[in-house]
Amino acid sequence: MTNIHPESPEDFEFIETPAASCTTPADDCGVRTTSYPAIKNAPVPADAAGSDSFSNTLLILLLVVIPWYTARQIGGGLKTTIFFAIFTTIPILMAFWSIASSISPRKNEKAKYAGRPVEHYLHFHSEHDRATYRGKSKIPMEVFYEKYFAGEVDFKMDALEALEFRHDWANFRFTMGLFKHFLFGFIPELLVHSRSQDEEQVRDHYDRGDDFYAWFLGPRMIYTSGIISDIKKEETLEQLQDNKLAVVCEKVGLKPGDTVLDLGCGWGTLAKYASVHYGAQVTGITLGRNQTAWGNKGLRAAGIDESQSRILCMDYRDAPRVPGGYKKITCLEMAEHVGVRHFGSFLAQVNEMLDDDGVFFLQIAGLRKSWQYEDLIWGLFMNKYIFPGADASTPLGFVVDKLEAAGFEIKGIDTIGVHYSATLWRWYRNWLGNGEKVKAKYGERWYRIWEYFLAYSTITSRQGGATCWQITLVKNINSTHRVEGINSQYGLTGAREAAIASVGKGSLPSAHVTFKA
């Protein structure tokens, strides 16, 4: 069944999310497995090697001793040591990471791998690759995905299913391709991260075509995590997103007439939801031209006049101010694109634009501090192919430190990584269901890149390699009336139930609105 989205400025269709394919039943893999309908359950939730066996002390020692010893052999002093260090640092780092990622033991061996040969999962097109990667001779994950995108290897089964058993056929050794991207792609972007770079990357990504995103995001057109309300049932993608919109509005204590600034508003779904159901006055900010047109059309179709709410196409640094500051500022998974270099100044700007009794809601993706090598390889893949420039995905401690330094007080934090996994699982199925249309317009390579991204991200967000946090904040000043925020100090479940009670008239308000009642 298909339907035309009433807000779309383009003529294309959405499909209903296809039913989940049958998951390979988990054998006795040594650890407990689950079977909740809400998520894609892991058949083998295994841990691999990571930070607990990585020696920073040894690495630093090598970085210091090798140039020092080399300089000493020729009678050199400090200046000679520094000179040699310029040439030895990168080779030492590359060799150390390559060796460590190859020989480090697993974090634990509680979970038993299925133990099937490489050829059970993968079909290589060249005789050389078939001879190289077979039996127990695993392929480095970075080498695999580059070959997969180039059409040199195929899965013999559903991509997500094969990736669930990736430890049978892939290793997580750091390769030359990873080092090349890290040194000549990731690091330069991290250091520069200019305004023009932001604009170029965002528009190249989000203005690719609304249909490209619609074919996995579905009718809500929301590119951020939804929220599960019941782990014992499979809610639709649209229900997950409606849950999230309600949670956001209740966590910030949204009231009629509140001025709201939504930074990185995407296609404007939150702006429309807050305008229709809560009577808020919303200004959405995005660099995407397509998103701006879509969002404004959606607001007008829902009966929201431009004098109440609007979507503006501009850099966040140029966001309009209002007298006294916005009552609410929301930022859902846009801050990662600000970059580490500008993260502190971005938060300072948000603080300056917020009313002294206002609320700031930040939903931000991040990585775990106790990393495993596959987390880092996944992160570099994401930076190269999916979100170039989004280098502010960090452990939670960094985010909290920057928020407090910018003058905020944390009111509440919820971790929603597994909710993201549930969302991604539905996006993945939508992508497969629209596969032929994607290939016809954008080509096999783009289809495969997003297939891999959505499948692997379903796994990594479920197992904690990458996660996402909802952080509710107020200004940390003496005149903030903290007592007035007690009634809206919700966790995820409480916020959803409050939305039903306050504006839902017994049921959760829907984001699918074409005319304001």
Curated annotation (Swiss-Prot):
One GO-annotated biological process of the protein: methylation
Location of the protein in the cell: Membrane
Entry protein name: Sphingolipid C9-methyltransferase A
Classification via Gene3D superfamilies: Vaccinia Virus protein VP39 (3.40.50.150)
GO molecular function: methyltransferase activity
Recorded name of the encoding gene: smtA
Glycosylation site residues: N290, N478
UniProt organism field: Emericella nidulans (strain FGSC A4 / ATCC 38163 / CBS 112.46 / NRRL 194 / M139) (Aspergillus nidulans)
Family to which the UniProt record says this protein belongs: Belongs to the CFA/CMAS family.
